[in-house]
């Protein structure tokens, strides 16, 4: 359980509201409240409705001093392609919050939302070891992180269950 604990730090690349690609870390939001939400994959059935719902209510989050970050195990290029796909064709259009890439699944793993992954320890020719993760996606997890970087609220939904944006706003 992560509630009341310091939110795991991350640094990754993200597609920003203006469609630029930038490095983003949780520490960039120090002193701000953050909703960090995970979704399974780009170009899937339920996910666009949730991402669009966050975007539609973004001004309400901002009026409460809350930044919104979305994250999946997809690449920044997949996020960008999804943003550049019309909503009527299964895309998400130009959502106005950052979409974080998590190709190595380290962010999803650190927030304990990764499901269906298989880990393997791989040793290089130089004898150095590394843990790799194959397969797996993020469950629908939502985290409210306070100004000090502490997780104050967490909700985790199984893959077929959508999340309630009103509940995140209520928190």
Where are these regions (language model features)?
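Chalcogenol-based redox active-site neighborhoods
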Residues: 1-171
């Amino acid at each position: 359980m992560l509630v009341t604990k310091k939110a795991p730090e991350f640094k990754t690349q993200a597609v920003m509201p203006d469609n630029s690609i930038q490095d983003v870390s949780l520490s960039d939001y120090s002193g701000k409240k953050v909703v960090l939400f995970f979704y399974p994959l780009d170009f899937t059935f339920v996910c666009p409705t949730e991402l669009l719902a966050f975007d539609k209510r973004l001004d309400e989050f901002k009026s409460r001093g809350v930044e919104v970050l979305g994250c999946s195990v997809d690449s920044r290029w997949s996020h960008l392609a999804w943003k550049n796909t019309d909503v009527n064709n299964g895309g998400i259009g130009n959502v106005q919050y950052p979409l974080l890439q998590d190709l190595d699944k380290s962010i999803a793993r650190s927030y304990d939302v990764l499901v269906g992954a298989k880990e393997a320890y791989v040793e290089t020719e130089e004898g150095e070891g590394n843990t790799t993760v194959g397969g797996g996606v993020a469950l629908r997890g939502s985290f409210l992180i306070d100004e000090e970087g502490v997780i104050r609220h967490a909700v985790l939904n199984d893959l077929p269950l959508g999340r309630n944006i009103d509940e995140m706003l209520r928190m």
